[in-house]
A protein has these predicted regions:
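Aromatic-rich, solvent-exposed beta-strand/loop patch
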Residues: 126-130, 152, 157, 199-219, ...
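Aromatic- and charge-enriched surface segment that lines or borders ligand/interaction sites
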Residues: 71-77, 98-105, 131-175, 189-191, ...
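Detector for C-terminal structural segments
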Residues: 24, 47, 86, 90, ...
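Gly/Pro-rich hinge or "lid" segments in bacterial periplasmic/extracellular proteins
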Residues: 61, 89, 107-122, 213-282, ...
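N-terminal lobe/hinge region of extracytoplasmic solute-binding protein
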Residues: 45-137, 144, 167, 174, ...
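Ligand-site clamp/hinge motif
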Residues: 146, 233, 266-317, 358, ...
Length: 641
């Protein structure tokens, strides 16, 4: 696709990590620390902090008696339908298994004990619980569940369901997640019908753990057992959750529709006011983005997050837009970049040498691509935490050096990391093939023992050619990959693109297969990182992780992850994350791509949103609403069926 951003499509089709929050973050999207103030609605009882929520460092933004979130319209009307698209197909309603292809938004019916908000980083507020209790050292946490909480069939949600859900994810969750969970959580117990306690293992960093377990999706034990469901297996019978939406209809490979539960137990909670406003959320499936765009123009679905710069710049000239029936808008986004890039499969021997990876990266010409293919709409990604204060910049600070020096002394890092600026994408010229970068890449491959032969193809001492295959399941992305392939061929690399469908892509990039050379994916991160980093970049989970698809195994990265997890203040966390960013970038496990700092959206003119959007979410499915009068006008004009 002409400058696609894979994050949106991937988010719709990806299965959820075992402990997703409502805001869509993975486990440990926020962390915790001591010293939370009484002014934030907390009180001490028997040496426990009792609170309506928890914050990483400092006070919570919202007090215990807040009426609603600042960024919602508490009087937003309920009704109508919003529809979007997803690529490929699906054959399962289980978002927590690597088997099968889960439907888009399959985790939407489930709620967490705690939930994040879109205008505050590092916080979580009670949702299924009314309060939580924890000691200053966070060695355990007790959640006081709301007695009124109900599953969507009306049955009560109890502490027994929480313990059951924990045990299911511990024994049947994604392998990388349960590996991390088993290292950190000693156990869960129901103290009574509405009190559940999680105890953490001694000696592990506990800063994140109350919020980690608070992000547990809660499943109905009775429904699970009565239907003989299995968290590890795909299936079209969904688990029973307590959320505001339930599955209405699923046509495998075609569409999936969720309807708002009119009897949703939590509708009047302050945390829920002004949210979940649509009666229905429908996802239509298409083979690729080009076909999906034609469907949008014809009204097959009504809201489109445009991830193609080419389409955005050249193809929004259809009749519905000209007639004012469709709104085309760029809305502000304060979020960091999603880490999109070409990912190496580091399990392949040919990619073990960082000089090879650096040489291949030199052949991607971002500047030419942005001007020629992307209409100048993108900025380059350099950092795993691009477009945030967590990105490493300039030479390391003294505080960063203090963290990095021991790793250099132990031979885990090159000494240059202490004095050099972080690894940046190579600057390239205006022509597709930058000759200066070609010479640099040639020297690197020569030094790595990959020498050009009489046919121009580089081979190692054993006579094996240097081959690079790009797996691609999006036809519109071919025009991005093909020039890269041509540049690599000029370097003597036997490069090619291998086109496959979405089902094949998922099968070949999941554990234990990992059958690829390079793919387009994401270097994941969160604003307040913790044990999620072990899933994304940790050595221990590299061969079982659904997220560390590149197979990164680095003792230096592991040590830095431990320092991030152990940070005791906001300043310490920032410094440790910036230092980790330097180390990750030095590993050269990816060829970073691009991002834009706005939401480019188009939608039929029957949706409305708060005047000021929150910085960390577009929220069209969460807190936008439906204007029935505008919808009727569109139908009267023949713009919608």
């Amino acid at each position: 696709m002409g400058g696609r951003n894979v994050g949106r499509a991937a988010a719709l089709r990806a299965r959820s990590v075992a402990f997703p929050s409502v805001a869509g973050f993975c486990i440990a999207t926020a962390a915790l620390i001591v010293g939370l103030a009484l002014a934030a609605g907390m009180a001490r009882a028997q040496d426990l902090i009792v609170a309506h929520g928890i914050s990483t460092f400092g006070d919570l933004k919202y007090p215990a008696d807040f009426p609603h979130l600042d960024y919602v319209n508490p009087n937003a009307p309920k009704g109508g339908e919003i529809s979007e698209w997803a690529p490929g197909g699906f054959d399962s309603m289980n978002p927590y298994s690597v088997k099968g292809r889960a439907a888009a938004l399959a985790s939407a019916p489930f709620e967490n004990i705690l939930t994040g908000v879109a205008d505050e980083i590092g916080s979580a507020y009670c949702l299924l619980c009314s309060t939580l209790e924890y000691p200053a050292d966070r060695s355990f946490v007790i959640f006081n569940l709301r007695p009124e909480a109900r599953f969507s069939d009306g049955s009560p949600l109890t502490a027994a369901d929480v313990v059951f859900s924990y045990k299911m994810f511990l024994t049947k969750g994604l392998t990388d997640f349960r590996t991390v969970l088993a290292q950190q959580v000693q156990g869960a117990e129901a103290l009574d019908a509405h009190r559940v306690k999680f105890t953490f293992k001694p000696g592990v960093p506990t800063r994140d753990l109350p919020q980690d377990v608070g992000a547990l999706p809660i499943l109905s034990q009775a429904h699970y057992e009565a239907n003989k469901l299995d968290l590890e297996e795909p299936g079209m019978v969904p688990f029973l959750g307590s959320g505001p939406y339930v599955l209405e209809n699923a046509e495998a490979g075609s569409s999936v529709t969720y309807r708002r539960n009119p009897d949703y137990w939590g509708a009047d909670l302050p945390i829920a006011k002004g949210k979940s406003n649509f009666d229905r959320i429908r996802i239509e499936y298409f083979g690729d983005s080009a076909v999906a765009f034609e469907g949008f123009k014809g009204g097959a679905y009504t809201f489109r997050n445009e991830n193609s710069s080419r389409v955005w710049a050249t193809q929004y000239d259809f009749p519905a837009l000209a007639a004012g029936h469709v709104v085309k808008a760029e809305l502000p986004s304060g979020t960091k970049a999603n880490g999109q890039g070409f990912l190496f499969n580091l399990r392949r021997e040919k990619f073990q040498d960082p000089r090879v990876r650096e040489a291949i990266a030199l052949m991607f010409n971002f500047e030419w691509s942005n001007e020629t293919l992307f209409y100048g709409l993108y900025s380059r990604i350099n950092s795993v935490w691009e477009n945030s204060w967590l990105a490493a910049m300039g030479v390391p600070s003294a505080a960063e050096v203090a963290l990095l020096q021991p790793l250099v002394d132990q031979g885990l890092l090159q000494a240059g990391i202490l004095t050099d600026e972080p690894v940046m994408g190579p600057a390239s010229g205006a022509t597709q093939l930058d000759r200066r970068n070609l010479r640099r890449a040639s020297a690197l491959l020569d030094a790595a023992g990959w020498m050009p032969g009489g046919d121009g193809v580089r081979r190692n001492a054993a006579g094996e050619p240097l081959t690079v295959a790009f797996l691609n399941d999006d036809p519109s992305f071919e025009r991005v990959i093909n020039p890269y392939v041509e540049n690599l061929k000029s370097l003597g690399v036997d490069a090619r693109m291998e086109s496959i469908d979405q089902a094949q892509m998922e099968a070949r990039t999941r554990p234990p297969s990992y059958d690829f050379d390079m793919i387009v994916g994401n270097a994941r991160s969160s604003y307040v990182s913790g044990s999620d980093l072990m899933q994304y970049y940790g050595s221990e989970t590299a061969d079982v992780s659904a997220f560390n698809v590149m197979g990164l195994k680095s003792p230096a990265v592991d040590r830095m992850i431990a320092l991030v997890m152990a940070a005791k203040s906001n300043d310490d966390l920032t410094v440790a994350t910036q230092a980790l960013d330097r180390v990750l970038r030095a590993e050269r496990f990816w060829v970073p791509q691009w991002f834009k700092a706005t939401h480019t959206v188009a939608y039929f003119d029957m949706y409305e949103h708060p005047e000021t959007l929150p910085p960390y979410a577009l929220g069209e499915l969460e807190f936008w609403w439906f204007n029935a009068d505008k919808a009727a006008a569109l139908k009267a004009a023949g713009a919608l069926r």
